Amino acid sequence: MAIQQRDSRGGTNRDARTNRRIKAREVRAIGPEGEQLGVLPIEQALARAQELGMDLVEVSPMAKPPVCKIMDYGKFKYLEKKKQNEAKKKQVVVQLKEVKLRPRTEEHDYATKIKKVREFLGESNKARITVTFRGREMSHRELGQKVLQRIIEDLREVAVIEAAPRMEGRQMFMILAPNPRMLQAQRDRAKAAAQAAPAAAPQPGAPAAPPAAPAPAPAPEQTPEAGPR
């Protein structure tokens, strides 16, 4: 449950009014399990909360009368903070990485640049592919178009076009984004690996395997008995 307390300027503060800070004379009270307690005088609502060892929290100050819920406010704030931190950890910060090429790019250099773009996309980032023209190369823009089109073909399984090729000054560029199917496949593989890991690990408390039996000692060599002379 999100709780926000409006201030006098129409903004919001993070902390709601609680207990004796609630100014209303009567409130619409909600119990700790979400049960409706009806409209109560503030003193009666405070007494209910005190009996349960909890707080009375104003969750909807703009309502008439204000809505207040009986809860453990300290625990509520702790859980809200924990959820916010977990949500931040799950957020993926998408960056725009740039790879630069020339209209005439050597094959080994092209392969290196394509590998780098694949890495960017695999990390959920976007890639700006830029072809820079110099001097008379500006009269052969079709070479840049061919380079970008080749990249589109080579990366069609892992990328989608977010911004189609276009010119800006002496540069022709496009922006590629990760293919959603590729990202989903990565998440599925990671999930499967995470589920398989506990199964492969030894279970706590499981009896250790008995030690291997020692190999039998070799039989002593029999020496022939000497016969009578």
Swiss-Prot record:
Residues 192-203 have a biased composition (Low complexity). Disulfide bonds: none annotated. GO terms for molecular function: ribosome binding; translation initiation factor activity. Residues 204-221 have a biased composition (Pro residues). Its main location: cytoplasm. GO terms for biological process: ribosome disassembly. Gene3D superfamilies: Translation initiation factor 3 (IF-3), C-terminal domain, Translation initiation factor 3 (IF-3), N-terminal domain. SUPFAM superfamilies: Translation initiation factor IF3, C-terminal domain, Translation initiation factor IF3, N-terminal domain. One of its GO terms (cellular component) is cytosol. It is found in: Cytoplasm. Residues 1-21, 184-229 are annotated as: Disordered. Keywords: Cytoplasm, Initiation factor, Protein biosynthesis. Belongs to the IF-3 family. Monomer. IF-3 binds to the 30S ribosomal subunit and shifts the equilibrium between 70S ribosomes and their 50S and 30S subunits in favor of the free subunits, thus enhancing the availability of 30S subunits on which protein synthesis initiation begins. This is Translation initiation factor IF-3.
